[in-house]
Amino acid sequence: MLLVLSQRQADKETVNFLQSRMKTVWVKLESAEEFDVKAGIASGAFGLVTDGDPKNIAQAYAELDGLKGGTLSRSPLNVAHRGDPFKYNENSMEGFRAACEAGATHLEVDAHLTKDDQIVIMHDADLSRTTNGRGNIRSMTLEEIRQYKIIRNLGNMTTGSESDIPTIDELFSYCRDKEILIFFEIKSSASDFVSVFKRKIEEYGMEDNIVVISFDRTQLSAVREHIPYLWALDLNYTKENIGKTITDLCTRGVGIDMSYGNVLPQLTRSMLDRGFPPAYWTYSTKTDVETAIRDGVYGITNNDAVAAGALPEKLTFGELAPVKKSEFLSEEFTLPVFVESYDGTRTETRGALYAYRDAGEYAEVILRAETGKWSLLSDVVRVEYASEENSASSSEDGGCGSFVGLPFACAAAAGLVLVLKRRRG
C-alpha cells in the first residue's frame, strides 16, 4: 500500500506511524530547494516526489555517498519472532513481555483456532513439539488445551519453566495499551478464523496495531475482504519474474514479507521502487540484525530482539536554548541531542547541522549525530534566535564539535528513495 503525503503532513512521527504498519510513504515536496529536499529525506519516507528540478535531489544524495559509516533516515523495525524464543518458552506471554520491555517494536506471533472457535497463540498445529501434551489444536477445546503447558523454546530445548498457552485475549489485553505492534501470522486454515479474528480485534480496539502475515493465500484474501482496514503480507516468494510477482501482489491487494535468503540489492531496490518496503525473516542474532539494517532491510523479523534493543534507533531532544543566528554559520556548530536506543536508553551527544533554514524569528534545523553504529537524522526542529547583543550566549552554548559539510548518507541501509519528476499538464 502506497501513500503520498504532503510535506506538511510528513513529519517523522507520522511517517513512522504509517510505515511501521508496512504502508509505504512517499512525500510530495513543497519545493526542490535544499532544505525541503533534506527535510523529505529526514522524514524517513521511502520516496520523494517533486515538480521541481530532480537534479537538486540527486545532488543531495550524491553528498551521502561519501559519508563514512552511513546514516539512517528512518528506524528499521525490530520484530520479535515468537517473543524472546530461546531464553523463554516459544510463543509465551513471558517471552512477549521480555521482548517488549527490551525494545521490540513488533511481536511476531502465530495463531490457530480451537474446536470451540477460540484463537490460541502457537506455531504448530499440534501441541507435541513445544508443550507437555499432545493433540491437534483444531480438534480440541480451549479447556482441553489449557490443561497443558509450554515447556520448550524455539530450539526444542526444555527451559525448566512452564508457561500457559496464550489466547488472543491475553495477547491483546497486554498489547492494547502499549506502543507495540503485532505481525499476526494466521496458521489456521479454518474457514471461520477471520470472522473470529475480526471480532477480537474490534473487541480490544486493536484495529491500528496489527499487520497480518500468512503463507495461506486464502486467508490473506479473506482478511482483505472482511477486515479491509488491516494490511496483509504474503510470506510466499518464488524467484520468478519480478514483474509477475508485483502483478500478483497488486491484483490480490497484499504486500510481501520474504525469507532473508532472498536479500539481494537488486530485488530490494526493485520492490522498493514499486512501493513495497523491504521486509525479511528470520534473522538469528543482533549481529545479523545490524547486517540487515546495513543491507537496507526495514522490517527485520529476528530471534534476538532483546539484544537488538540496545541498537540506536532515533534522535530526541531536551529543551533547546536560544541560539544567535550568526552561530548557525559556523562549520563547527552543534546542538545537544540524545541518541535513543530501541530499549529506551538515552545517551547525550552533540548533533551537527545537516540542514538549516532561517524562518525569520527562529531557525529550522535538522541534525545529524554519530552513534557508534551509524549516524541518525533528526526531524525538523525549531530553535529560537538569541539576541546578537547578548554576550552570555557563546559558540560553546550552541556547541562545538567536529562537523563535516552538510552530510547525509542513506547507504544501502537507510533507504532507497525514488525521485519522481511529475509532468505538468
Label each region the model flagged.
Residues 1-330, 336, 364:
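Phosphate-group recognition and catalysis centered on beta-loop-alpha active-site segments
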Residues 115, 342, 370:
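Short, ordered coil/turn segments that flank beta-strands lining enzyme active or ligand-binding pockets
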Residues 332-343, 367:
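Beta-strand-rich structural segments
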Residues 344-368:
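Serine/threonine-rich, repeat-prone extracellular segments and beta-strand-based repeat modules
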Residues 370-381:
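Short, exposed coil/turn segments at beta-strand boundaries within extracellular/luminal domains
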Residues 380-398:
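C-terminal low-complexity, Ser/Thr- and acidic/Pro-rich disordered "stalk" regions positioned immediately N-terminal
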Residues 404-423:
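A cross-kingdom C-terminal cell-surface attachment/processing module
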